Amino acid sequence: MKDLIKAREEIDLIDTEIIRLFEKRMDIVKDVVIYKIANKLPVLDSSRENAMLEKNINKIKNEEYKKYYEKVLKGFLEASKDMQKELLK
């Protein structure tokens, strides 16, 4: 049981770091929106999104984890696009 508690505590620490990085990412997304507005660019840039997905998924060393990381990354992208759309209203 102690190992389970320790593992969960480690996960909690990692989650805290993920939250910090997510907030930082979303702050930068706001900067991207400002740029897109100033330059009359669309929210969706499929070529950038696809290249970023491929590049980052390929950074995962454990092949077993790649499909799961892809889901996480796509979730981040959707959240970013949703926020951009909200800010463009």
Please give the residue ranges for each predicted region:
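Domain-level signature for soluble enzymes in the chorismate/prephenate branch of the shikimate pathway
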Residues: 1-89
